[in-house]
Design a protein with these regions (language model features):
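Juxtamembrane extracytoplasmic/periplasmic/luminal helical "stalk" adjacent to the first N-terminal
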Residues: 6-15, 19-89, 207
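Extracytoplasmic/periplasmic sensor domains and loops in membrane signaling proteins
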Residues: 86-104, 111-114, 125-165, 191-239
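Conserved beta-strands of PAS-like sensory domains
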Residues: 128-132, 169-203, 244-257
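Soluble periplasmic/extracytoplasmic beta-strand elements of cell-envelope proteins
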Residues: 116-119, 175
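Beta-strand residues that line the small-molecule/cofactor-binding core
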Residues: 5, 169-171, 229
Length: 258
C-alpha cells in the first residue's frame, strides 16, 4: 500500500509539474507571438505614415512652385518678352526676367531649392530658360509632363501640372503652368531639387528618417542615435511615372513594445 501511495503521489506531482511547464511554454510562445504581431502592426503603420508624409511634403513643395510659377506666368513684362522673341534685346531681357528669382529671391525662396526656370511654346518646344541654375538638363520637357499636357482636354489647358521625374538618374520636381493667363501663349516650368525637402518627412512623422538614392547612396541622415533599439522600416518614393526615385527609411523604437 505504501509503495502504491508513493507511486500515485509521484505521478500526481509529475503530472502537475508537466502541466506547469507546458503552461509556462505556452505563455512564452503567446507573449512572443503577440509581440511579433504588435511589431508587425507598428511596421505596417509606420510604412503607411511615411508614405502619407512623403505626399504631404510634395504637396507643400507644389504650393511654393505653383505660387512662383503663377507670379511669373502672369507677368506682363515677361509675356511681352516672349511675344517678341525674334528681337535679340527682348530675348536677353527674357533671360534676365527668368534669372531674377535666383538673384533677388521670391516668396518662399527658403522653402525650395530652385534649379531652373524654362519656357515652352504651345507645342511644348523649349524657347527660353534661365541662365542661372543647373546646366545638366535635357533641352526638352520630361516625357511624363509632355504626355500629361498632350492628353488633356481643352477645358483643362489652364490647369497647372506637377510631377516628380528622373533626369539622368537624378530626381527632380516640376510645376508646369500656362503662360499668359486665360489666353496662354506657352508654358512656364519651375524645376526644383526635391532632396532639399526630404528631411521634412521626418518632421511630419516625428520619427527618425534617413533617405537614400535608389542606388543606396545616403542623401540625408537623421540626427537621432538609431544604433540601439530601432527597427528600420523602408518605403520607396516613386516618381510620377512610377519609376523609383528615393528610398525612405524610417526607424521604429521597438523598445516601446517590450
Amino acid at each position: 500500500m505504501r509503495i502504491e501511495a508513493l507511486s500515485i503521489k509521484s505521478a500526481t506531482i509529475a503530472i502537475f509539474t508537466m502541466i506547469g511547464v507546458i503552461a509556462i511554454i505556452l505563455s512564452l510562445l503567446a507573449g512572443s507571438y503577440f509581440r511579433q504581431a504588435a511589431l508587425g502592426a507598428q511596421i505596417d503603420s509606420l510604412s503607411r505614415v511615411i508614405e502619407v508624409a512623403s505626399q504631404e511634403m510634395l504637396k507643400e513643395v507644389s504650393r511654393h512652385t505653383f505660387d512662383l510659377g503663377m507670379k511669373l506666368g502672369h507677368s506682363e513684362e515677361l509675356i511681352q518678352a516672349v511675344k517678341s522673341l525674334d528681337n535679340t534685346a527682348a530675348h536677353n531681357r527674357l533671360v534676365e526676367l527668368l534669372d531674377d528669382p535666383f538673384v533677388n529671391g521670391f516668396v518662399g525662396f527658403s522653402k525650395i531649392d530652385l534649379e531652373k526656370i524654362r519656357i515652352y511654346n504651345l507645342e511644348l518646344e523649349l524657347i527660353s530658360q534661365s541662365s542661372a541654375g543647373t546646366t545638366e538638363l535635357d533641352g526638352q520637357l520630361s516625357d511624363y509632363l509632355t504626355e500629361q499636357v498632350s492628353n488633356r482636354k481643352h477645358n483643362e489647358r489652364l490647369k497647372a501640372i506637377d510631377a516628380l521625374w528622373i533626369s539622368s538618374d537624378v530626381p527632380l520636381y516640376s510645376t508646369l503652368v500656362p503662360l499668359g493667363g486665360l489666353r496662354p501663349i506657352g508654358y512656364l516650368e519651375i524645376i526644383i531639387n526635391p532632396v532639399f525637402n526630404l528631411p521634412d518627412i521626418g518632421k511630419i512623422t516625428k520619427t527618425p528618417v534617413n533617405t537614400f538614392s535608389i542606388t543606396g547612396e545616403l542623401i540625408n541622415q537623421d540626427e537621432h542615435d538609431i544604433s540601439h533599439g530601432y527597427l528600420p522600416v523602408e518605403f520607396t518614393l516613386h516618381a510620377s511615372d512610377d519609376e523609383p526615385a528615393f528610398r525612405i527609411v524610417g526607424y521604429e523604437n521597438v523598445d516601446k513594445l517590450n
